[in-house]
Amino acid sequence: MAGSTLSSYEVDQKEYYNRITEEYDLHYAIKSALKYRYGIYHKIFSNINLKTMHILDAMCGGGESTGYFFRHGALVTGLDISENCCAIYRKRYPECSVVCSSILDTQFAGSSFDIVMTDSLHHLHPYVNQGMDEIRRILKPGGYFCCWEPISHSLADLLRKFLYRMDARYFLENEGSIDIKRLVQTQAHHFQMVDCVYGGNLAYLFVNLSMALRIPVRIVKFYSPLFIVAESFLDRFQPKFLSCWALCLLRKKEIFETF
């Protein structure tokens, strides 16, 4: 394990994901869940030439995000705190390197990556700012940080909090939605906003979150094509407060602003 001594939150997270690795991968790595994920990423990355870019898939799990970048010719490195997740990643993407480490202290050299991608900032509470400091350090000047996160102050956030109280099996105590507006404001000296897309309804809940909702994978495969199309249509009219997630793309400033 790279990096310094883990906090109690990180130890709990490592043990948790080591325990549920197989079940997590069964749900999040199925074809329908990946199709949904890749379609979302394409909303932001379609205008960026990813070929030969060095990308860190931070808190990568079994590499659910890596596939999108790998198929576009990027050089991808995975990072996860769970040894079991790293083992799956290594088997799935033998062409890529993977590091078993906390994102809070990666031991990568500064300015190592063109892009850092994560869908797991919400696992970092109360260390989100510390995590962003490390992400900024390892990003090249002008590099991109992209996060796909459940958002706070939304109807979906209320549902998440209800599920947390009712079912502790698939949720950790420190998990919480991300306040995107606050994140952007606190990072304004270091990053500029490039784009932010909001969305998520039927497919996000019943395809992407099938594990949390205890929906068998065989059933997800049956209805997922319809739900993905339906969500794409509903997203056109859905107000932000009804959205489940935000996909936010920030760019590291070439010169740090001190004012």
Give each language-model segment a name.
Residues 1-50, 52-61, 68, 146-169:
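Conserved class I S-adenosyl-L-methionine
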Residues 104-116:
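A short acidic, Gly/Pro-enriched loop at the edge of an enzyme's catalytic core
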